[in-house]
């Protein structure tokens, strides 16, 4: 074959036309061959560049086939490849001829212009230079390219069927249909196969998707290829979700093979992208970001169905000692310490705090592993690889990683996500298995986050959520997590994604709102929009998903572990995750998922997550007032232990009129614990006849405090021991030792004075038991007196430095059996006297509190104190003593029903009739005189109202410093009912039943011009534990008297349930309660709060997807949503009134009316329904032949 056998293909300059498409003409061809670069150089020795002008940007180009010579400009370009090839397809009745011209170098354009021609559309011309060729052109040919330095044209012409084609078609019909196979080449830059030829047919237009035929479009365009078939797809937006991509591929396969039954073909589809820069041209598509503009997607049909699995690469973490300052790769803070500062991953080499180990992603990429010398650094030298090992490794990783991109919904049904962890991932990527490491280097207690979190992460919708940065001052050296450089400065060093991580503070395990990402101010603009905090919260209700939302399968509770993507790690040992022989999967281990789910929420709970805050009990902040000016009754050093913990603890006790406070020392304000006097049930001294270890005991409802002594055993030894600065721990005290040590002998101690001097002495001590003998001989009276004199001298010497001779003497006389007179101990030792002084002081403090002043905010509040008894108090109640109140009611201090800003509610019982009551104790000392109306409002309102829907007020008693409000006691509250329900939310029927009673109670209160102002589920009490209980409103501490057309402006209520006008400090009226009703209905039906506190309420209300995500609102009626929207109106004039809410169609239901009639029959009073509705519902019963249940 000589040079004349090769067709000549030229690009020539043409004037720009009005159309943006390049025109390509086929002039003539006499043969079909494949050209290489060397062939072009060999057969093109002469040039006539004068004949051809250069190509400029924007000009049209024409592909010609002439007998002229190829311009030198095109021949010498390294990236110029021209190929012609003719292929006959056995399953079609026509043959295809391909002509491909690629210009991939910007130097081929006009001189000095480095731009390129992008996204051009090539279409066949309407005429051919050789009219004898009878060809049918393929309609609507379109091609796009994402390479910014190349443009290309691809032309396909269809021949009329020949005799050979007809014969091949008949042979094909006799054989079974076979799906195209996967071709993998090791030299992608020089090898061309039929899968790389661009054959275009009419573009596919699936339903419900907008496509554009224009070459200039702002969306995403890519190509689908299956065998020799190829389609161009254009979608709006910059990304396409993997679920939609798989659907496009599935529809494409169905279209090109319409006669075949696809069935569950979607389970067999694998999607790859062509990447000529990689060793293996075809790269598995795992995320939506893999599909960019111009990507060629190869559809490969697997030999077996691929179950949905989630791929994780767990880190192999072990304790590591760093020689240079190192920062945590998770939080960015410095790893402090001299040795064993943190954990290092054996695979990827990343470093973490131990505290961060349970939060890190399972994303070990093994980048730390050493590259073998045989592995090339570029694809061009890839033929030296051991292809068998590489293909096996690549095939395993691809098959295991493919399911990270699978949609959860399949044709055959949903499947529970599986997790596959290969043994290669868990072993040593460099030198052997992880278990072969020395035990001292192995970490069996640190790993990543739990597996159920991997499922939630993999199945969530991945949307771009920007970080909310705020200037932050760091207390520890921290690096920027974007540029990995240190945040310099003393204050305001950088920016942090704002908000504190409140995961540990929330008992229901709610996720944090912010990710606390750290970066420089200059780097904040370049940080990716991937805030994990908000994304977690808003993942399940935003349209499409990358990986799809997986459906649950109850019968699949095990997860196969495998290698995979970059996710965050589980709280199980790293080593046990590796595979073992006989595990059931090649190269991997089948790991039971039962343990992973034992402490994790159910899949139903995971799938129902939304951007809204989970419903929880809102705790009002208490005003913790520490009255430093209270009358001090007694103070001193005390050693104590409890019946629950036998460890001796020494603190400086201060007894005042409110309680006992255990301080760290005499001067500090920090205290260890506080025992309020109202929690003390009794104080008892130890019996003199019985030998005991403690002096006296303090009994509370929670535990018993045993007062051991005023000095510890260790401190006593420090006084009497003479060896320099060595304090020995005391031996175990026997029950017959009366609290003193059972050993004797000579010892030494180092006593440091307050000025810092040191005194050392060696003393021999013979210790006696009370009424007993020593281990050597019986002590005589003279020996006892001699020993006592020794101890007395020691105490006197120590007192010069400690200043506590009395305490030393008391302790020694108590423990050694000597009295202060020098004789053996009797019942009236100094220890007993010291115990009696403490018990007397505590018992005196437990007596009724005498009138005394307190200081709040620097102002005296004596105005609220009433010095004499029997008079009328400020609230109109008769002053009584606490003894008189205790004779009438018994308060159960351990039964705390609730606590709030004004006081605490305890359970109690009426001593005379045995009726259980709720007693609200309000401490008047917490309120200054100008807030006295807050105390009076609730009492006045409760005395005024009388309705079955409002809690019944019984009695109010006032003492000198407390107010006792006695009310009826009910079973529980509405919040407890919601949280304890099976799904964490109530059904529509139950919600309607409760809301109907709430609205009726509000109608009564508003008629009395009373606005509750703090309506929330915690303040809605239930009288029973049934599904349809009676409800009553309580807690009128924020209630206000507001007329029909009046407005008030004050601080009221709980922010989570307050209307916008209150939060903005604007005037509010009785419609405030209606907003609260809307929030109550929302949280009852969904189990979440409707709004986020950091976003504008108007924007959240207008965003229907935010307010009502599919889970669970797709199960709730439209009337309920309309009812909520009518209540949650920002403008007060548009908000429903009580009457309008009661007449709403959602509340007008026969089932509700029937349930309410049953309740009224049980109560014995008709207070919710009205007689005017009876005729309408009786007619409904007759029309639908319904038997009433309320009769």
From Swiss-Prot:
Residue numbers binding ATP: 897-905, 920
Organism of this sequence: Caenorhabditis briggsae
PROSITE patterns noted in UniProt: PROTEIN_KINASE_ATP, PROTEIN_KINASE_DOM, PROTEIN_KINASE_ST, ZF_DAG_PE_1, ZF_DAG_PE_2
Zinc finger residue extent: Phorbol-ester/DAG-type: 314-364, 466-531
Subcellular location: Cytoplasm; Membrane
Reactions accelerated catalytically: L-seryl-[protein] + ATP = O-phospho-L-seryl-[protein] + ADP + H(+); L-threonyl-[protein] + ATP = O-phospho-L-threonyl-[protein] + ADP + H(+)
Region (Disordered): 11-48, 108-155, 549-594, 730-786
Ranges of compositional bias, category Polar residues: 756-765
Stored PANTHER family: PROTEIN KINASE C, MU, SERINE_THREONINE-PROTEIN KINASE
Residue stretches making up the PH domain: 632-713
Protein keywords: ATP-binding, Cytoplasm, Immunity, Innate immunity, Kinase, Magnesium, Membrane, Metal-binding, Nucleotide-binding, Phosphoprotein, Repeat, Serine/threonine-protein kinase, Transferase, Ubl conjugation, Zinc, Zinc-finger
Active site: 1014
Protein name listed in UniProt: Serine/threonine-protein kinase dkf-2
Cellular component annotations (GO), alphabetically ordered: cytosol; membrane
Domain Protein kinase: 891-1147
Modification Phosphoserine, positions: 1046, 1050
Entry EC number(s): 2.7.11.13
Family: Belongs to the protein kinase superfamily. CAMK Ser/Thr protein kinase family. PKD subfamily.
Cofactors (names): Mg(2+)
Residue stretches of biased makeup (Basic and acidic residues): 123-139
Lineage, highest ranks first: Eukaryota, Metazoa, Ecdysozoa, Nematoda, Chromadorea
Regulation: Activated by DAG and phorbol esters. Phorbol-ester/DAG-type domain 1 binds phorbol ester with low affinity. Phorbol-ester/DAG-type domain 2 binds phorbol ester with high affinity and targets the kinase to the cell periphery, enabling phosphorylation and activation by colocalized tpa-1. Both domains 1 and 2 appear to bind DAG with equal affinity so may contribute equally to translocation and activation.
PTM remark: Phosphorylation on Ser-1046 is the dominant regulator of catalysis, phosphorylation on Ser-1050 has a lesser effect. Prolonged phosphorylation results in ubiquitination and degradation.
One of the record's GO molecular function terms: diacylglycerol-dependent serine/threonine kinase activity
UniProt xrefs under InterPro entries: C1-like_sf, Kinase-like_dom_sf, PE/DAG-bd, PH-like_dom_sf, PH_domain, Prot_kinase_dom, Protein_kinase_ATP_BS, Ser/Thr_kinase_AS
Compositionally biased region (Low complexity): 140-150, 738-751, 773-786
Role, per record: Converts transient diacylglycerol (DAG) signals into prolonged physiological effects, downstream of PKC. Acts in the intestine to regulate both innate immunity by promoting activation of pmk-1 and also stress response and life span by acting as an upstream, negative regulator of the daf-16 transcription factor.
Entry's Gene Ontology BP terms: innate immune response; intracellular signal transduction; phospholipase C-activating G protein-coupled receptor signaling pathway
